Amino acid sequence: MTTKDETNGEAFERGRRLREEMFGPAGMKSLDNADDFQMPLQDAVTRICFGEVWSRPGLSPKLRSMLTIAILAGQSRPDQLQNHIKGAIGNGVSKEEIREILLHAMLYVGLPAASDSWRHATAALKEIGAY
């Protein structure tokens, strides 16, 4: 969590560590390969998303992953959903819990979005050997 006295660099480094813990080396490619055009986005994702918000003490990483899966399913964001499915496994979310999240989300996001999300979740789980 960013405090008044903390520098942006500290939040960035904390976010970098958390990204690597969640997604492993494959999840670091977009940051490590960012050029001048892409770096502002990667800085925001790393520093704000992971260094400031994901690292707050109010929710566990597992619960944050579960919430993120449900939100991304509702937004029909397949690339982000696949990335966060993989990160969720690293945060202790089981395949069965992911199935239940998608089933529950289906009631609120609709069948087309749920069907796409289920397909992308299956692909992500298979890719990391968690299916």
Regions found by a protein language model. Give the residues of each.
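Acidic, glycine/proline-rich low-complexity segments that act as flexible tails and inter-domain linkers
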Residues: 1-61, 90, 116-131
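Short alpha-helical scaffolding segments that buttress acidic/His motifs in well-ordered protein cores
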Residues: 45-49, 66-71, 101-106
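Substrate/cofactor-recognition hotspot
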Residues: 111-112
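A glycine-rich phosphate/pyrophosphate-binding beta-strand-loop-alpha-helix module
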Residues: 96-100, 116-119
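Short amphipathic alpha-helical surface patches that mediate protein-protein
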Residues: 86, 103-107, 122
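Short hydrophobic interaction/assembly module
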Residues: 55-74
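Mid-chain, well-packed structural core segment of small domains
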Residues: 66, 73-99
